[in-house]
Amino acid sequence: MDPIADLILSFTKFPGVGNKSARRMVFYLLKRDSAELQDLGRRIATLKDELCVCSRCGNVSSGDPCPICSDALRDRETLCVVEDIDDLVSFEQAGIYNGLYHVLDNRVSPFDDEDLSPESVDSLLSHIRELDAKEVIIATNPRMEGDLTYYTLLDALREAPGMREGMKISRLAFGLPVGGSIEFADRMTLHTALESRTAVSAGNGGGEEK
C-alpha cells in the first residue's frame, strides 16, 4: 500500500478522526522536519512505558498513586465515579470539583455487548470503603449506556456491606444534554450538572430524595 494512504488509514482508527482529518494530519506531518517526526515517534513508542494506571482510582499518570489521589488538600470524603479517563480530565480542566475520582473504564452497553465486570464493581466498593466516603457521585454520561451503568452501580452500592452509615449517593443533574458526553461539555454545563446533582436514597428500595 502507498505509505501516505497507509498512514491515513491508521489515523482513521483514532476516535472521531475521519478520512479528511486523517489526510490533513498526514500532510501536516510531511511538512515537518525529520528530527521532529523522530521525536514524535519516540514519544508515541514510549508512551505506555512511561505511564501507569493508578491502583487506587484507575487514572493514568507517571506515578502510582496518581497526583490526584496523593493530594492531601483534596476532599477525601467525596468520590466521583466516571466512565473513563476522558471524563476525569474534563472535570479537572473545568476546575469545579475538589474530591477524588474512581474510573470504571467500562460500562453497561447492550449494543457493544459490554457489562461492568465484577472486578470493576469490587474495585469501586473497596475504594469507597477505604475512603469511608460520605458521598459517592455517579457521574455517568446522560445516555442509555450511562443510565444502565448508573442503575447497576446504584444496586451494587445499596447491597454492599461495610459502607458508612448515611452515605449519600448522588447523580449529575441534567444540565448535560441527553445523549451528550461529559468529555465534550463546557465548564458552565459541568458546573451546573455537578452543583444541581440529585441525591438518591442509599437504602434498599429507596428512590430519589425530594
Residue ranges and their predicted role:
Residues D39, D64, D86, I96, ...:
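Residue-level signal for pocket-adjacent positions within structured domains
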Residues L125-K210:
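Long C-terminal interaction/binding lobes of large macromolecular proteins
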Residues L37, D113-E114, G146-Y150:
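Alpha-helix N-cap/helix-start motif
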Residues A5-L9, R23-F27, Q38, R42, ...:
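Solvent-exposed alpha-helical segments within well-ordered globular domains of core cellular machineries
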Residues D2-I4, L9, K13, R23-L88, ...:
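Cys/His-rich Zn2+-binding cysteine-cluster or related metal-binding knuckle/ribbon modules and their
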Residues C66, F91, D147-T149:
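Short glycine-/acidic-enriched loop or helix-start segments at secondary-structure transitions
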Residues A22, D71-T140:
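Extended interfacial segments that mediate partner engagement and assembly in macromolecular machines
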